[in-house]
């Protein structure tokens, strides 16, 4: 039997040879994200990976592809007293809204600014940059409707990738209005597309009645003439949405953020209102969006709270790391942690002394390791080199009798004898 990871899921592994799947690259991206989010005043919230399906039906939208085609549902046990259908989270926002409401975070000083990161799951058609198990960096702001906040979350994401040296990004923005002005736009779309339904795909025909905005999001019919001539939402905005839209563009300009207006961006979730945006990189081809998001001023009310504005984004970690690899941007990962000390022992008498030294080194805050395979000294030295150790402490039976050890500086290639009780202080002086 061949045992392998399910299709569309990836192992994240220790080692530069694994490219974008190198776990150290993931750690650095997470660290940079946390640092930038905290600079912006965001705090971490860790929601569960599983939520009740009802949350996504009401929050994300019953007719969205995520709910109808892509969710990994969990069938409850027959003897489960709480036998409601659950699902692995397909995105973060709905679960973070649920956590904000359930735990009374609305009682804290507002707005609430939170970040989260971790895995999410969708039954996707697997291709470059699109997986069934994927990871997101997520930020959300609850309780502020100022368009300056929309601009802030866009800037936050750009600051994260700027620290990684990533350039050549395109910020695409649009406004899809609100429940007051969207019905008029919805009707305009239906009037426009109705004569062409026989030429459009099955999904478009389904969306025509249930959610005509999603017609603009169709990939199969993207080049159809009716798509290119469709009404644009910006022509149908109410006064409030137009002021918000103009405010967003003003703030982006003030921040020096270049942007393009793309009236076909509607995003694939029903909860969006007003601002929607995507940040693109051409190296990913069809999956060129590294991250996207927008405003969802009605979502919290839909989930059961009081009317509360919200805005945020989800950034695809796999996509960011894949682009960094394709661009050859390795500098952010150059400070890969090294093993401080490898303890090489030779002979039975040296073994317990080496183990005692190993634990003393670790207690002193130095990363340290020792051979557990009974290898020769030559093989131990070779292994220490592969581990990129800074120093090797060599202990043989003669050294033990003399109360000393040989300390080899691996970068310099020098070696000297040091009393055992001075090993730690010697290594600290060498690093000073």
Curated annotation (Swiss-Prot):
Disulfide bonds: none
Catalyzed reaction equations: tRNA(His) + L-histidine + ATP = L-histidyl-tRNA(His) + AMP + diphosphate + H(+)
CDD domains in UniProt: HisRS-like_core, HisRS_anticodon
EC number, as in UniProt: 6.1.1.21
Keywords: Aminoacyl-tRNA synthetase, ATP-binding, Cytoplasm, Ligase, Nucleotide-binding, Protein biosynthesis
Subunit structure of this chain's protein: Homodimer.
Family classification: Belongs to the class-II aminoacyl-tRNA synthetase family.
Protein name: Histidine--tRNA ligase
């Amino acid at each position: 039997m061949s045992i392998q990871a399910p299709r569309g899921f990836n192992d994240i592994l220790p080692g530069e040879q694994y490219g974008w799947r190198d776990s150290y690259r993931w750690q650095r991206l997470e660290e940079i994200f946390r640092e930038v989010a905290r600079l912006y005043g965001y705090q971490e919230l860790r929601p569960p990976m599983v939520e009740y399906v009802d949350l996504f039906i009401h929050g994300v939208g019953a007719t969205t592809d995520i709910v109808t085609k892509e969710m990994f549902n969990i069938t409850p046990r027959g003897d489960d007293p709480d036998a409601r259908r659950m699902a692995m989270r397909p995105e973060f926002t709905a679960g973070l809204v649920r956590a904000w409401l359930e735990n009374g975070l609305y009682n804290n000083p507002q707005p609430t600014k939170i970040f989260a990161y971790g895995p999410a799951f969708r039954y996707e058609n697997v291709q470059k940059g699109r997986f069934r198990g994927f990871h997101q960096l997520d930020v959300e702001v609850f309780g502020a409707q100022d368009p300056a906040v929309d601009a802030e979350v866009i800037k936050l994401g750009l600051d994260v990738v700027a620290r990684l040296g990533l350039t050549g990004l395109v910020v695409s923005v649009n406004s899809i209005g609100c429940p007051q002005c969207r019905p008029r736009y919805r009707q305009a779309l239906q009037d426009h597309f109705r004569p062409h339904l026989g030429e459009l795909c099955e999904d478009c025909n389904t969306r025509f009645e249930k959610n005509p905005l999603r017609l603009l999001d169709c990939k199969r019919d993207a080049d159809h003439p009716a798509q290119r001539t469709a009404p644009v939402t910006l022509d149908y905005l109410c006064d409030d949405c137009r002021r918000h839209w103009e405010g967003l563009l003003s703030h982006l300009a003030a921040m020096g953020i270049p942007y393009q207006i793309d009236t076909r961006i509607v995003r694939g979730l029903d909860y969006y209102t007003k601002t929607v945006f995507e940040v693109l990189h051409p190296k990913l081809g069809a999956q060129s969006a590294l991250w996207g998001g927008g405003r969802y001023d009605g979502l919290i009310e839909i989930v059961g709270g009081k009317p509360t504005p919200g805005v945020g984004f989800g950034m695809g970690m796999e996509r960011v790391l894949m682009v960094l690899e394709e661009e050859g941007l390795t500098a952010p990962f150059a400070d890969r942690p090294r093993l401080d000390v490898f303890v090489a022992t030779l002979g039975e008498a040296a073994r317990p002394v080496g183990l005692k030294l190993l634990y003393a080194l670790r207690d002193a805050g130095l990363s340290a390791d020792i051979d557990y395979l009974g290898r020769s000294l030559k093989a131990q030295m070779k292994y220490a080199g592969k581990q990129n150790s800074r120093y090797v402490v060599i202990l043989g039976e003669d050294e033990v009798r003399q109360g000393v050890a040989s300390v080899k500086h691996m970068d310099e290639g020098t070696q000297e004898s040091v009393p055992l009780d001075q090993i730690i202080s010697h290594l600290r002086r060498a690093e000073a």
